[in-house]
Curated annotation (Swiss-Prot):
<dbReference type="Pfam" id="PF02518">
    <property type="entry name" value="HATPase_c"/>
</dbReference>
<dbReference type="InterPro" id="IPR052545">
    <property type="entry name" value="Light-responsive_reg"/>
</dbReference>
<comment type="similarity">
    <text>In the N-terminal section; belongs to the phytochrome family.</text>
</comment>
<keyword id="KW-0804">Transcription</keyword>
<dbReference type="InterPro" id="IPR029016">
    <property type="entry name" value="GAF-like_dom_sf"/>
</dbReference>
<dbReference type="InterPro" id="IPR016132">
    <property type="entry name" value="Phyto_chromo_attachment"/>
</dbReference>
<protein>
    <recommendedName>
        <fullName>Cyanobacterial phytochrome B</fullName>
        <ecNumber>2.7.13.3</ecNumber>
    </recommendedName>
</protein>
<dbReference type="GO" id="GO:0030295">
    <property type="term" value="F:protein kinase activator activity"/>
</dbReference>
<keyword id="KW-0067">ATP-binding</keyword>
<dbReference type="InterPro" id="IPR013515">
    <property type="entry name" value="Phytochrome_cen-reg"/>
</dbReference>
<dbReference type="Pfam" id="PF00512">
    <property type="entry name" value="HisKA"/>
</dbReference>
<comment type="function">
    <text>Photoreceptor which exists in two forms that are reversibly interconvertible by light: the R form that absorbs maximally in the red region of the spectrum and the FR form that absorbs maximally in the far-red region.</text>
</comment>
<feature type="domain" description="Histidine kinase">
    <location>
        <begin position="536"/>
        <end position="751"/>
    </location>
</feature>
<dbReference type="InterPro" id="IPR001294">
    <property type="entry name" value="Phytochrome"/>
</dbReference>
<keyword id="KW-0547">Nucleotide-binding</keyword>
<dbReference type="InterPro" id="IPR036097">
    <property type="entry name" value="HisK_dim/P_sf"/>
</dbReference>
<dbReference type="InterPro" id="IPR005467">
    <property type="entry name" value="His_kinase_dom"/>
</dbReference>
C-alpha cells in the first residue's frame, strides 16, 4: 500500500484525522540519520534504514553495538560529559567527525531523550561554522532591534516575516495566527510578486489538527527540505526493550503525515519550515515558510530562527497585552463603580442598571438582563421577556459552569436563531443556578464575510473505485463564506470581568443579608418591647379612665338638677371622650395581645366562619339593606378560626359602613390559583379609596374620615386584620376605584 493513500471505507469522520498517531510514524526524513541508544551503556538499539548511505555502515553492523563503533574516544568522552545535563537542548548541536566511505564527514548531532532512551540525530554539516555564526548573529541582532521598535502585533508580524525570509531565503514567509476555534489566518506575508498572495486568507482547524498543534507546542521548529522524499523506516520498527513504537515527538527528523505532504503538494510547495509562536505556554500562531524547490536549512540557521521565534513570542505577548491594556483599565474602572453603586444601595439590581456606567459598559454588550428571585430587569436591546425566561430555564438545566460565553448562541441553543438581531452572542453569569438567578449580556448578530484559502468544507474526494478518501483540498483559491448567527466575539478580559462581578455580587448580597438579619433581630426586639409597653400602658390606663367615666356619670345622676346647661354639656363631652379613649385603649390592648397569643391552628370551614359573622351583623345588614353575595363555597383552610373570623368581620363591617349607594352589595369569595394558595376577597360598591391611601389605611388609628362620619370607629380594624393575616404567613392588600367601590384581598399560608 502506498503510504500517501488513506482510504476510508465507511462514513467520513474528520475526528479520525485528529487521532492519527503522527508522533510514532516509525519513519524519518532522509536528510539525516537517527540512532536510538540505551543511555546507561550507549548500546545502539535502533537505527534508521539509511545508515549505509550516510555513515557507510549497514543497520545490522550497528544494532546492539556500542557507540564507539562510530565515535572516537575523545568524542565519546565529550558526549558522556554532555549527558550529565538534564535538558539536552542546551548542548545542541554537538559537532562530531565520523568516517563514512573512507571520508571524514562533519555532522551536527542533535540529542534528546524519549521514554528513558537516548536519541541522536545526525545531519551532515558542510558550512563554515565561524563565518555562519557571525553572519547569523548579526542578522538576528538586527531583526530583534527592528521587532522591538514595533508598536502592534500587525507590525511585529510583518517585520518578523521579512526578517525570517532574509535569514532563510524561502520564497514565501507568512505569519499565521490561530483563533479560539483553532482556525488560522494569514496576518503577514512576504513573497515575490509572481506568487499568489495568501494574506488575509483563513484556513480551517482541520488543516492543522490537534495532535499536530501539540507537537508544534513541544517543538519550536519543523523542517521539511523536500516534500517528495521517500520516508526512511526505523529498524527495528519497535524498540526491543519495551516492544513499543518509538516516540518521535521531539525528533527533528520525524517523518510527517502523508496528508500533510499531499497538502504541500496541492499548494505547489516542495520545502517548508514552521516556527512556533507561543503565548502563555499556548500555541498562538506559526511562522510558515514555503519554497517551490527543495531547500535544506542547516541546523545553525534553524537555531537562529528558533531563537527569533522565542524572542518574538515574548514581544508578541507584550504587544498584544499592551493593546488590551487601555480596554482592561476601562473595564476595571467600570467594575469598581458598579461595586460602589451596589454597596451604597439596598437593591443591587437597580445599582447595576440605573447608573452610568452600568453593566452594559462592563463587557461592551448591547443588552443585559438581571434575573433574580423570579423577577427580571433589563437594559438596552434584549429579547422579549418570555424568551429570556425560557433561556434562563434552558441555562439552569444545561449549563453547569459559573459563567458561559459564546459568540454563536444558536449553535448550542437553536431557539436563539429567532433572536439573532439582539442575542447572537451571550455571556451568562450564574449567581445561583438552583434558584435560576442569572445576569445575561447580549450582543447582536454581525454578518461578515470570511475569506478562506479554498473551500474548507471539502475534506474528502471519491476516487475511481467509489471509495471515499480523506484528502486535503486541491484548490487554495479565494473562497468566500458569509458567516451568520455570530456576534462580535467576547474578549477574555470581558469574560473575566463578568466572573469577578459575580464574586462582588455574592459578597455584597451576603453582607446586605447579614445587615438585614441584624435589623430584623433589632426590629423584633423593639416590636416585643413595644407590644409589652402597649399592653402595660393600655391595661394601666383603663382603670383611671374608667374612674373618670364613672364619676362623670355619678355627677350627672346626683347633681344634674343643680348643674346648668353649659355644665351638663361639658360633662357629657367628658363622658364621650373618656368612652372613645377607652375604646382606643381596648383596640390597642387587643392589637398588642395578637402578637403575644399563640395561634390555635386547625382545619377550618370558612363557610361556617362567614355565616357566623353575617349572623352577628344581621341587624346592620337589615338596617342598611345591603345585598350579600356569596357566589361559591369557600374552602377548608388550616388557620386560627377565631382570628380569621375577626378578619372577615372587620372587612365585612367596613364594607357595610363605608357605602353611600342606594343599592348596596357585598361579594365574598376566593380565587383558586394552584399551586399558589387561594386568594380570598371581600368586594363592595361603596365609597372607594384613593390610591394614595392604599397603604395608609393599614396603619393603626389612621382614619380617612372624621369620627362623626360613617358611624365613627377607632381606625384599628384594618391594622388588626393585617397583623392576623401576616401572622398566618399571608398578605393583605386593597384595589379600589374612588367613588365606585373596593376589593380587599388576603392570602393565608400554613404556619
Amino acid at each position: 500500500m502506498n503510504i500517501n493513500d488513506i482510504t476510508i471505507p465507511f462514513q467520513v469522520d474528520l475526528s479520525n484525522c485528529s487521532k492519527e498517531p503522527i508522533h510514532i510514524p516509525g519513519l524519518i526524513q532522509p536528510h539525516g540519520v537517527l540512532l536510538v541508544l540505551q543511555e546507561v551503556d550507549l548500546t545502539i538499539l535502533q537505527v534508521s534504514n539509511n545508515t549505509f548511505n550516510i555513515l557507510g555502515r549497514h543497520p545490522e553492523q550497528l544494532l546492539n553495538q556500542h557507540l564507539s563503533c562510530l565515535l572516537e574516544a575523545e568524542q565519546l568522552s565529550l558526549l558522556k560529559d554532555c549527558l550529565a545535563q538534564e535538558d539536552l537542548q542546551i548542548i545542541n548541536p554537538l559537532e562530531f567527525i565520523i568516517k563514512s566511505h573512507n571520508e571524514s564527514i562533519s555532522f551536527d548531532v542533535i540529542a534528546h531523550r524519549s521514554n528513558n532512551l537516548l536519541i541522536l540525530e545526525l545531519e551532515a554539516n558542510l558550512s563554515d561554522k565561524t563565518h555562519s555564526f557571525f553572519r547569523f548573529y548579526h542578522l538576528v541582532k538586527l531583526a530583534m532591534l527592528k521587532l522591538q521598535g514595533t508598536a502592534t502585533t500587525t507590525e511585529i508580524s510583518q517585520i518578523l516575516a521579512q526578517e525570517v525570509r532574509k535569514i532563510t531565503g524561502f520564497d514565501r514567509v507568512m505569519v499565521y495566527r490561530f483563533d479560539e476555534q483553532w482556525n488560522g489566518k494569514v496576518i503577514a506575508e512576504v513573497k515575490p510578486e509572481y506568487l499568489t498572495s495568501y494574506l488575509g486568507l483563513n484556513y480551517p482547524a482541520s488543516d492543522i489538527p490537534q495532535q499536530a498543534r501539540k507537537l508544534y507546542s513541544q517543538n519550536w521548529l519543523r523542517l521539511i527540505p523536500d516534500a517528495k522524499y521517500q520516508p526512511v523506516p526505523i529498524v527495528p520498527i519497535n524498540n526491543p526493550l519495551n516492544d513499543q513504537p518509538l516516540d518521535l515527538s521531539r525528533s527533528v527528523l520525524r517523518s510527517v503525515s502523508p496528508l500533510h505532504i499531499e497538502y504541500m503538494q496541492n499548494m505547489g510547495v516542495t520545502a517548508s519550515m514552521s516556527i512556533s509562536i507561543m503565548k502563555n505556554q499556548k500555541l498562538w500562531g506559526l511562522i510558515a515558510c514555503h519554497h517551490q524547490s527543495p531547500k535544506y536549512i542547516p541546523y545553525e540557521i534553524r537555531s537562529a530562527c528558533e531563537f527569533l521565534g522565542q524572542m518574538t513570542s515574548v514581544e508578541m505577548s507584550a504587544k498584544e497585552d499592551s493593546e488590551d491594556t487601555e480596554d482592561k483599565i476601562q473595564v476595571k474602572s467600570v467594575h469598581s463603580k458598579l461595586v460602589q453603586y451596589m454597596s451604597a444601595e439596598n437593591d443591587f439590581i437597580n445599582a447595576l442598571i440605573d447608573h452610568q456606567p452600568n453593566i452594559l459598559d462592563l463587557v461592551k454588550a448591547q443588552g443585559a438582563a438581571v434575573c433574580f428571585n423570579g423577577n427580571s430587569c433589563t437594559v438596552g436591546q434584549v429579547p422579549p421577556m418570555p424568551d429570556i425566561q425560557v433561556l434562563v430555564e434552558w441555562m439552569s438545566q444545561n449549563i453547569h459552569e459559573e459563567i458561559f460565553a459564546t459568540d454563536s448562541l444558536a449553535t448550542v441553543y437553536p431557539d436563539a436563531e429567532k433572536l439573532r438581531d439582539v442575542a447572537s452572542g451571550l455571556i451568562a453569569l450564574s449567581i445561583s443556578r438552583s434558584q435560576k438567578n442569572y445576569i445575561l449580556w447580549f450582543r447582536p448578530e454581525v454578518v461578515r464575510t470570511v475569506d478562506w484559502g479554498g473551500n474548507p468544507h471539502k475534506p474528502v474526494e471519491v476516487i475511481a473505485n467509489g471509495e471515499i478518501r480523506l484528502s486535503p483540498r486541491k484548490s487554495f483559491d479565494l473562497w468566500k463564506e458569509t458567516v451568520l448567527l455570530k456576534s462580535q466575539p467576547w474578549k477574555s478580559h470581558e469574560v473575566n470581568a463578568a466572573l469577578e462581578l459575580r464574586s462582588a455580587i455574592i459578597g455584597i448580597v451576603l453582607q446586605k443579608a447579614d445587615e438585614l438579619a441584624q435589623l430584623n433581630i433589632e426590629l423584633e426586639r423593639s416590636n416585643q418591647e413595644l407590644d409589652a409597653f402597649a399592653y402595660i400602658a393600655s391595661h394601666d390606663l383603663k382603670e383611671p379612665l374608667r374612674g373618670i367615666h364613672n364619676y362623670s356619670n355619678f355627677l350627672m345622676e346626683d347633681y344634674g338638677e343643680i348643674i346648668d346647661a353649659p355644665g351638663k354639656e361639658k360633662l357629657l363631652t367628658l363622658i364621650r371622650l373618656t368612652q372613645r379613649m377607652e375604646d382606643l385603649i381596648d383596640s390597642l390592648l387587643h392589637f398588642s395581645r395578637l402578637g403575644r397569643v399563640d395561634l390555635s391552628m386547625q382545619d377550618t370551614d370558612l363557610n361556617e366562619i362567614v355565616h357566623r359573622i353575617l349572623d352577628m351583623l344581621s341587624g346592620r345588614i337589615e338596617e342598611t339593606g345591603v345585598e350579600i353575595r356569596i357566589l361559591q363555597l369557600l374552602p377548608v383552610v388550616y388557620c386560627d378560626r377565631i382570628q380569621i373570623g375577626e378578619v372577615f368581620s372587620n372587612l365585612i363591617a367596613n364594607s357595610i359602613k363605608y357605602n353611600d349607594k342606594a343599592n348596596k352589595w357585598i361579594e365574598i369569595g376566593y380565587i383558586d390559583n394552584p399551586p399558589l394558595p387561594p386568594t380570598f376577597y371581600v368586594r363592595d360598591n361603596g365609597i372607594g379609596i384613593r390610591e394614595k391611601h392604599f397603604e395608609t389605611i393599614f396603619r393603626i388609628f389612621k382614619r380617612l374620615h372624621s369620627p362623626s362620619k360613617y358611624g365613627g370607629g377607632t381606625g384599628a380594624g384594618l391594622t388588626i386584620a393585617k397583623k392576623i393575616v401576616e401572622r398566618h404567613g399571608g398578605k393583605i392588600w386593597v384595589e379600589s376605584t374612588y367613588g365606585e367601590g373596593s376589593t380587599f384581598y388576603f392570602t393565608l399560608q400554613d404556619v
